[in-house]
């Protein structure tokens, strides 16, 4: 058993108020923040990198927006110059020489922030973190893997302990309301091994909105595509899901007024197509005012379209489909997961009604919206024959436009993963 890791959360330190944040000492005049989305290794151990990316990282955009807010408020001192460098390792190399030069420069603090790290990226993120920490660079790591492991195993796990033992700072949970304080710890050279914010997820009202950086978007095939999370959390209880144990089951939502200026600024730099990264936009209590905002912007002469993730029952919300169409929704991603009721019951996905799937797709099609479904293979009642028949039915009976197939995976942060660990089941 790994010895327990310290849980470091001082609610006064991480309050929005600036009185708890210590400015940078006078001898520190520059802070360079490398916001890094790590890539992943393929099955043969090679690093995956593309000539152009497909979907930009919303986490990088969130942290860029939070950093811009810190800069504007000058809470770390009027003398401190803050620079932000976005690095998406899936489309570019780590700027190793520049990072080491900044880290060694007198009067400068540099920090590498491995952001939004998912489980399939964690091995690569660990290698990056250990390499730079061994060279004396300050390193922080956050995202769903470390947050999920901390949420489900608060006593500590070997992968987290390996990082903290090497001097890497682990951040579990969301950092709105805490980012300035974390950066204060960077410039004052007092980073802690672990910050656990999972118990107090921040409200999103009046928070800085994700900022799309044009220089970052140039590395993507669709350069007019941006991301925004208008809400976080999900009210359902699927056993394979990590969202509910990291972001919680209580929906936390942005308001339309918080989004307006950012959408206009993004439009002025060529961003007019969005992917709402909310796990379930339909359960955002402010969905109608947000769609009204987009309708108004379109009526003002801006042509804005978007894709969103929703649940299978979203079409039953009065006015939701019609207003989504008017606002410019081109595609919905629906968590169908299975057309076998026994599989859905086993996964705790009781909100799905297989008998209603075809009608749901028809309603969205009647509105001119394409339906892309997520489908999981490997549930207890799947067989090779049943899966083949499911694929046929998706096309012939459900008439979905597109399906993405996923192998059932016990992701850290899910109930499935915790159960398998506690039962001593083997996992790769």
Annotate each language-model stretch with its function.
Residues 4-264, 268-269:
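Acidic, low-complexity intrinsically disordered segments
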Residues 74-77, 132-137, 296-303, 367-368, ...:
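Short helix-capping segments at alpha-helix termini
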Residues 16-29, 317-328, 359-361, 391-395:
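Short amphipathic alpha-helices and their capping/turn segments at secondary-structure boundaries
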Residues 206-372, 377-379, 385:
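Radical SAM [4Fe-4S] cluster-binding motif and immediate context
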Residues 155-180, 323-332, 389-405:
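Structural recognition of alpha->loop->beta junctions
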Residues 42-43, 146-153, 178-179, 236, ...:
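Flexible glycine/acidic-rich beta-alpha junction loops that bind and position SAM and/or redox cofactors
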Residues 94-99, 289-295, 364, 383-400:
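Short, electropositive alpha-helical surface patch
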């Amino acid at each position: 058993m790994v010895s327990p890791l310290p849980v470091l959360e001082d609610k006064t330190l991480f309050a929005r108020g600036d009185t708890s944040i210590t400015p940078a000492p006078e001898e520190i005049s520059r802070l360079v923040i490398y916001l890094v989305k790590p890539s992943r290794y393929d099955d043969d151990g090679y690093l995956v990198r593309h000539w152009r990316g497909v979907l930009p990282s919303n986490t990088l955009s969130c942290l860029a927006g939070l950093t811009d807010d810190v800069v504007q408020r000058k809470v770390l001192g009027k003398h401190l110059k803050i620079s932000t460098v976005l690095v998406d390792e899936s489309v570019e190399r780590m700027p190793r020489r520049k990072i080491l030069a900044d880290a060694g420069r007198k009067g400068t603090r540099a920090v590498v922030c491995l952001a939004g790290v998912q489980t399939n990226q964690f091995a690569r993120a660990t290698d990056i973190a250990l390499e730079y920490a061994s060279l004396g660079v300050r390193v922080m790591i956050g995202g769903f893997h470390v947050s999920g492991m901390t949420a489900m195993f608060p006593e500590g796990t070997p992968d987290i302990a390996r990082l903290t033992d090497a001097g890497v700072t682990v951040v579990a949970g969301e950092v709105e309301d805490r980012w300035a304080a974390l950066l204060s710890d960077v410039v004052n050279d007092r980073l802690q091994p672990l910050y656990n914010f999972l118990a107090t997820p921040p409200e999103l009202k009046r928070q800085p909105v994700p900022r799309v950086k044009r220089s970052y978007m140039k590395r993507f095939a669709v350069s007019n595509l941006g991301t925004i999370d208008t809400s976080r959390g999900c009210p359902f209880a699927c056993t394979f899901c990590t969202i509910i144990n990291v972001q919680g089951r209580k929906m936390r939502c942005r308001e339309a007024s918080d989004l307006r200026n950012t959408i206009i600024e993004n439009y002025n730099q060529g961003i007019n197509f969005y992917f709402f990264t909310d796990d379930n936009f339909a359960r955002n209590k402010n969905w109608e005012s947000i769609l009204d905002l987009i309708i108004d912007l379109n009526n003002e002469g801006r042509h804005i379209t978007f894709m969103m993730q929703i649940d299978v029952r979203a079409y039953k919300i009065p006015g939701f489909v019609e207003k989504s169409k008017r606002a410019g929704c081109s595609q919905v991603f629906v968590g169908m997961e299975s057309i076998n009721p026994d599989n859905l019951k086993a996964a705790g996905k009781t909100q799905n009604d297989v008998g209603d799937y075809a009608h749901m797709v028809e309603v969205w099609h009647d509105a001119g919206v394409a339906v892309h479904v997520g489908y999981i293979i490997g549930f207890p009642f799947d067989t090779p024959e049943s899966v083949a028949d499911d694929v046929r039915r998706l096309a012939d009976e459900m008439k979905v436009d597109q399906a993405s197939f996923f192998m059932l995976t016990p992701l850290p942060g899910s109930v499935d993963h915790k159960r398998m660990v506690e039962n001593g089941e083997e996992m790769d």
